[in-house]
Every structure is written in C-alpha cells, then in structure tokens.
Swiss-Prot record:
Name assigned to this protein: tRNA uridine 5-carboxymethylaminomethyl modification enzyme MnmG
Localization per record: Cytoplasm
Alphabetized Gene3D superfamilies for the sequence: FAD/NAD(P)-binding domain, GidA associated domain, C-terminal subdomain, tRNA uridine 5-carboxymethylaminomethyl modification enzyme MnmG/GidA
Cofactor(s) essential for the protein: FAD
Keywords: Cytoplasm, FAD, Flavoprotein, NAD, tRNA processing
Cytoplasm is among the record's keywords: yes
Lineage: Bacteria, Pseudomonadati, Pseudomonadota, Alphaproteobacteria, Hyphomicrobiales
Source species, domain of life: Bacteria
Gene: mnmG
Function: NAD-binding protein involved in the addition of a carboxymethylaminomethyl (cmnm) group at the wobble position (U34) of certain tRNAs, forming tRNA-cmnm(5)s(2)U34.
First and last residue of the signal peptide: none
Keyword tRNA processing: yes
Stretches assigned to coiled coil: none
Length: 626
C-alpha cells in the first residue's frame, strides 16, 4: 500500500469529503482516512441540507465545484425556498434528504474523484518534525507520510454519549470515539474545549397518526442547489407538523432533574439555536407549545426524524413525552434521543486558511473548530482542503474574506472571535448580505475557483455560458426604453416627467416584475427564466448594491493593511489593554483587529498611522536593482 501522499484528510463526514475532494481537484495526491467507507456521507443528525444562511454555504461550496450541492440534489426528497416572501438576500434553499440516497451519492462522488484514495482505519497520532506536520500514525501502527494533514473528526474527539443517567464513550451512536488525536493536540499546546450537541428520538412513521397533523408540501417545481443540476428527478414527499402540549411540558418538568444538562452530568455548552426540548421548557416556560417537524428519513425507510424535540432524558421519559403529542400518542420509538459531548480546538488557534498557528501543514475543519451543522462543516472542509493542497505544493494559501461569501464570514468569526457555544451560520452574521446572496454564489466565487484551479471543465463551460447570457440579457434590458406615456398604455404608472426609462430601470420598481416588461418588449421572451430572475434581482437591488460596493471597498482597504510582523510594544499610543489583546490574538490585518472585542476605533487609527510611517521608512526599490 502506498504510504506517502501530498494531503491526508482524517474523517469521512461532510467536512472531510469536501476537504479530500477539493485537495484532489487541485491535483494533490490525497488520502481520506475514515473508520469505515460505508459511513462516508452519513447524516448523523437531521436528514436535511440547507436553510437560512446554511443554504448560502451550500451554494458557495457548489460554486467552487464542491460536492454537497450536487449530492443533496441527488438525495433530496423535498425542496423548499425558505423566506420566499422576503427579499432575495435572506432567502435560504433547503432540502429534506433521503439518508441512503445522500450517502450513496456522496460515496459515488468520492469514488469518482481522481487523485483520491480512501484508507479505512483510525488515525491515532500526529507525526511532526521541526514545527511541521509530517504525517499520521494509525491505531494499527501503520504510518502515512504527507505534506499536509486536514483533521475533520466531527464529534468523535473523546466523544461521550449521554442518555439519562447513562453515559458511554462514542463518536456517534454505535461508533467508537477517537481518543489519540486529542492527546496529540494537547502535546502541541493547542487549546481544547468541550461542546455538546444532541439529537431527537427516531420514530416509526407507520405508527404516526398522519391524519392528526398538518402536512407541509415542498416547492413545485423544486429548485436544485447546484447550477449543474438541470432538474430534480427524485420523487418528492410531504413533511408533517405537530406541537407539544401543556401535558408534554408537565412530563418534562417532572423529570428535568434526570436530564444530563440539568443534573450536572454535562458541563459543556450546547447550540443556542438548536436547544433540547427540556431546555425550551425551562427557558420558555410561558409558551403553550413548541413546533415539531416530522421529517421522513427516506423514500423506502419508515424512520421519521421529529425535528424540535432533541433530548437526552431517559428512554422511558422520552416515551412518555411522545404519548402526549398529537399524532404521536401511539408511535413506536425506534431509537431514543441522546446528547454527545466532544473535544474541540479553540478556533483562534487557526489562521484564516484554517492552518494551525502552532504546527505548519496541519489544518482543521468542521465541528472540531466549534461549529455545528453539515453545511458549516462542508464549507470549512473545502477551504481547508484547498489550502492543504496549495501548501503541500509549495504555493501560497487562499483566504476567503467577509466580502467574498458566507464561508469567509464564518471563518473570520471563528478565527477572530472564537466561540463559547457551537457556531451556526445565519444571514444576520454577514455585513454585505445584499451582495452575498444564495442566488449569485457562482457569480461571486466561480471565477476565483477557476483562478485557483479547483473548478472542473463542466462547471467552467457552464459558467462561461451563463455569465455571457447574463451580460447579454442585462445589456438588452438596459437598451430598451419607454416614455411614461407609453408605459401608461401598458398599464404601468410612472412619474410623468418625460424621462425615458429602460426595461432595467422599470424592474427596479418594487411593483414591476419581469413578465410585465416582457409583455412590452417581445424580444425579452428569448431570455431564459433563470437569467431573467438574475437580471430582475440586480435591478431591484441596483441602488443599494452601489452603496455596498463602497462599503466593501473600505473593508478591503483595511484588510490590505497587514499586521503580521508588527511588534505592538513599539507602537506608541496604544493602551495596555489594546496592546495585550493584539499580542494575544495576533490579527492578520487592521480590519481583523477591528473585529476583536476591546479594540477601539482610536486604537485602529493608531495602528493605521503606525503602518503608514513604517511604510515610508522602507527604502524605495529602483527597477533593475537587486
């Protein structure tokens, strides 16, 4: 067996698959080390991809030729655009997935990836020399050599499952934890913490009274995640919606002392935006009920995931809870819910490339960095995989910043501010969300992927064709003009100022949509619906986008002021508090320094002035010298 690679990726979850595929797409000889290939692409918690903020990440992964979007399209059994009635910036694509179809599609994608080999085994020890990673040792003693290593262990690092008063070591249900790597991290001096997440019981859908619950259909037609998916062909299903009742809350209150979160058995923090049902009852006791989404786990699988009642209460208490919920009174519980604690690395130990500051060539992605969610993991995996391949080949790393995409927002949040609870992506975290929309992820990122070399020929050809069609349609819309009097004859009420307005101008009005301008100018009928949608969104946002472009330019100026070699003791005027924070966190740029807690605008001004003075001191370079 070959034992030398450019990049080794540890873990076959959502982060690991994207990391391995991304590294391989850049031409790196890549090994994906996982316990069992059969678990690659497993959806450990909810059987769904996307959502608010999360759907943006899936589209961005797809724009860089990642796997998740296409795999979700292959496995999706209900697609919905969340926030459809709101503006395009906050709409979030989401898909309910068939677990088996999703995992099978991901495994097929991994098998089909050139330069990628899967090795079954448990990574036990990191090997390093002179401050650089050199490879890994497996639990069976095998050693693998590599120029870079990406670790994506999910909840497996010293994982501990809790169910009522019981607890036992596990990475997820029925799978062993990873124990050796945490010791390797501690030996390197990496700061570790503990986090907690949980999952609800699984139900037998054949025993649910579906007539007693509200049914929720998906969108028709379903909208794919990937621009390379022409249409969704998998059969689509409906989900159910029910609610807890006061009787449910009474059962929980009577037994909350048996929850590991409230008995003191679990000390670590769980995800604020995905609380357990016992947490909801304790913290929001004034509510009459809490919504539960009944999500089928597959087309030929009777298992149902009750989204909204994550719990680690004892098994018999979980049964008692279910018996009080409309539609679930007689349901059979196939598996109880549980909580899991696991180690994570303080993400402030990382560079924006996701390389650790303490050991060159070591990259971390996914829940190990304190995030929660498949989509957050996938986006980090892609970035880590790209950078690992670039580093192994002796190249410069790539940084995605807050103006590039949600993946840049997430990574900057992690490496700058750190986390005190599992980090989840929301649209509200992005300052530039008018430009960082789910619908334009490919327009923002695919050219960057082409420059990096991580985008394949199929996507490259599609992208060139789409961008040409978009430019042509926009130019056409801007070339067709009409007077207010002419518009009135078509039923459009405009200010009678005598000014001619283009079709693009008309689309900027909130009440005017593409079908109305197409009715005026028949030549617009040749524009495809998807391209027309992009033109209309650009028109609606045009004024606001101009302002945001100026904001992004100011942001980029601050991001261009590098602080990597600054000795803060030599910067006059900084307060001791600011100096201490800057020394401790070592921000890359003035922009990143400004996002640290306790760094004031005055301190930023001092830093910018210092950098300008230092730049003036450097000798000018004359062409031809040196």
């Amino acid at each position: 067996m070959r034992n030398s690679y450019d990049v080794i990726v540890i873990g076959g979850g959502h982060a690991g698959c994207e990391a391995a595929a991304a590294a391989a797409r850049l031409g790196a000889a890549t090994a994906l080390v996982t316990h069992r290939f059969a678990t690659v692409g497993a959806m450990s918690c909810n059987p769904a991809i996307g959502g608010l903020g999360k759907g943006h990440l899936v589209r961005e992964v797809d724009a860089l030729d990642g796997l998740m979007g296409r795999v979700a399209d292959a496995g999706g059994i209900q697609f919905r655009m969340l926030n459809r009635r709101k503006g395009p910036a906050v709409r979030g694509p989401r898909a309910q997935a068939d677990r088996k179809l999703y995992a099978a599609a991901m495994q097929a994608a991994i098998r089909a990836t050139a330069n990628l080999r899967v090795i079954e085994g448990e990574a036990d020890t990191l090997l390093n020399e002179a401050g650089r990673v050199t490879g890994i040792r497996l639990a069976d003693g095998r050693e693998l050599v590599a120029g870079a290593v990406v670790i994506t262990t999910g909840t497996f690092l010293r994982g501990l499952i809790h169910l009522g008063e019981q607890c036992w070591p596990a990475g997820r249900i029925d799978e062993a934890p990873a124990l050796g790597l945490s010791a390797s991290f501690e030996a390197l001096g990496l700061a570790l913490g503990r986090l907690k997440t949980g999952t609800p019981p699984r139900l037998d859908g054949r025993t649910i009274d579906w007539g007693a619950v509200e049914m929720q259909p998906g969108d028709d037609p379903p909208e794919p995640f990937s621009v390379l998916t022409p249409a969704i062909t998998t059969p689509q299903i409906e989900c159910g919606i029910t609610r807890t009742l006061p009787a449910t809350h009474e059962v929980i209150r009577a037994n909350v002392h048996r929850s590991p979160m409230y008995s003191g058995q679990i000390q670590s923090s769980g995800p604020r935006y995905c609380p357990s049902i016992e947490d909801k009852i304790v913290k929001f006791g004034d509510r009459d009920g809490h919504q539960i989404f009944l999500e089928p786990e597959g087309l030929d699988d009777p298992t149902v995931y009750p989204n909204g009642i994550s719990t680690s209460l004892p098994e018999e208490v979980q049964r008692a809870i279910l018996a009080t919920i409309p539609g679930l009174e007689r349901t059979v519980m196939l598996r109880p819910g549980y909580a899991i604690e696991y180690d994570h690395v303080d993400p402030r130990e990382l560079e924006p490339t996701l390389q650790t500051k303490r050991l060159r060539g070591l990259y971390l992605a996914g829940q190990i960095n304190g995030t929660t969610g498949y989509e957050e993991a996938a986006a980090q995996g892609l970035v880590a995989g790209l950078n690992a391949a670039l580093a192994a080949g002796g190249g410069e790393g790539v940084v995605f910043d807050r103006a590039d995409g949600y993946l840049g927002v997430m990574i900057d949040d992690l490496v700058t501010r750190g986390i005190s609870e599992p980090y989840r992506m929301f649209t509200s975290r992005a300052e530039y969300r008018l430009t960082l929309r789910a619908d334009n992820a490919d327009q923002r990122l695919t050219d960057k992927g082409l420059a990096l070399g991580c985008v394949g020929t199929e996507r490259a050809a599609f992208h060139r064709g789409k961008m040409a069609a978009l430019a042509e349609a926009k130019a056409l819309a801007q070339s067709l003009a009409i007077t207010p009097n002419e518009a009135a004859r078509h039923g459009l009420s405009l200010n009678r100022d005598g000014q001619r307005r283009s079709a693009f101008d008309l689309l900027s009005y909130p009440e005017i949509e593409w079908p109305q301008v197409r009715a005026i100018w028949p030549e617009l009928a040749a524009v495809s619906p998807s391209i027309a949608g992009h033109v209309e969104i650009d028109a609606k946002y045009a004024v606001y986008l101009e302002r945001q472009v100026a904001d992004v330019a100011a942001f980029r100026r601050d991001e261009g002021l590098l602080l990597t070699d600054v000795d803060y003791a030599q910067v006059p005027g900084l307060s001791n508090e600011a100096r201490g924070r800057l020394e401790r966190h070592r921000p890359r740029t003035v922009g990143q320094a400004g996002r640290l807690d306790g760094i004031t605008p005055a301190a930023l001004g001092i830093l910018a002035a210092y950098l300008r003075r230092e730049a003036r001191k450097r000798p000018a370079v004359v062409d031809g010298e040196g």
